[in-house]
Amino acid sequence: MYLEYTEFISEGAEDVTEEEYARHEMRAAKLIDRMTHGRIRDETAVRPCVRAAMRDLIAQSIAAEREDRQHGGREIASVSNDGISVSYAQQGDMQAHRALIRARIIAEYLTGETTEDGVELLYAGTDA
């Protein structure tokens, strides 16, 4: 586990149950493992940048799930106040936007980080 529930809560997260946290933590950890090609899975000490990425990924995932519940799974694309008009984004656009946010979070925290052998964590080639 890259980030404990107590750490997540201590960094300002509010109104998140342990059950809700566990579900989103697992998704975030799997995403980090996939994007780093498993290079950090067996490290004994969790890097601060990985903790920070986990915190932001979990928070983003929880916010997205709550937004889906609030708007029936649809993301608001625009709102017109005078005529009281609400437009919703297409489902594919919403998923692509969220994937881009997750990729940016990972890139922000893990770009430039290397293994003990000098291989960048996000490098997609072979570690030869």
Regions found by a protein language model. Give the residues of each.
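Divalent metal-cofactor coordination and adjacent catalytic microenvironments
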Residues: M1-A128
